[in-house]
Amino acid sequence: MKMADTRIHISSSKGVRLLALMLLVATHTLAQPRLDEPEIFLGAYGGATASTVFFNPSVPGMDDLLKVPIGWNAGLVFRYGAHKVCALQVEAGYVQRGWREYSSRSGYDYTRTLHYIQVPVLSHIHFGGEHVQGFFNLGPEIAYCILSQESGTKQTESTYQYRPIDHLFDWGVAGGVGLYGMHRKAGVFQLELRVHYSFGSLYNNSRAEHFASSNMLTASVNFAYMWQIK
C-alpha cells in the first residue's frame, strides 16, 4: 500500500510541475513583440485518435501498443493572436478515448470506449515563412465523459476494470506539433500531431481500492481549417 501512495504523489507532483511550466510559457509569450492589430481565427478540426490507459497494477492484455482502440475527434477552434510569434488557442470538441485488452492465447478481445467533451486552452507558438509555418501547442485540457461503451469478450484474470468509471471529469496536459499554410483569401489549413496525458484517474485510488492509478494517454492526428475573421 505504501507503493501505491508513492505513485499517486509522483503523478500529482508531475502535474503541478507541468502546469507551472505552462504558466512560464504563457508568461514568456506575453513578452513577445505585439501586432499592430490582433488577429482572430475561427474554424473546425477533425481527425483520428489512438488511446490507452496506464493501470497500476497493470491489466493483462494491454502490453501491445499496436493493438489500441482507434477513434475520432472533432470540434471548433478559436485562435486569438496579439503577438508576432504566439497566440492563444481555445478548442471545444468531442473525442473518443479508452483502452483495449487482447490475448489470442486466452481468447479475449475487449474494448472500452469513453466519449468525452473536451476543452483545451493552448499557447500557440509559430515560426517560419509568410505562407507556410511550423508550430507547437501546449496547455491544460479539461474533459467530461458523457458516455461509456463496452464491446468484445472480457477476460477472467482481471475484472476490476469492468466496473463503471468513478470519475467522469478529467484534466491533464496537451501538446502538439504541426504545419499550417495560410492564405488571406483561402484561409488556414493546419495539420497537427497531438498527445494528451490525463492527470486524473478513471477509478478511485484510495488505499482501499484496487488501482493506485488509472491515467489515460491519447494521441491524435488532426486536420483543421480556419478562417481569419479579423
Task: Give the ranges of each region predicted by the language model.
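Extracellular loop and loop/strand-boundary signature of outer-membrane beta-barrel proteins
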Residues: 60-65, 104-110, 157-165, 206-212
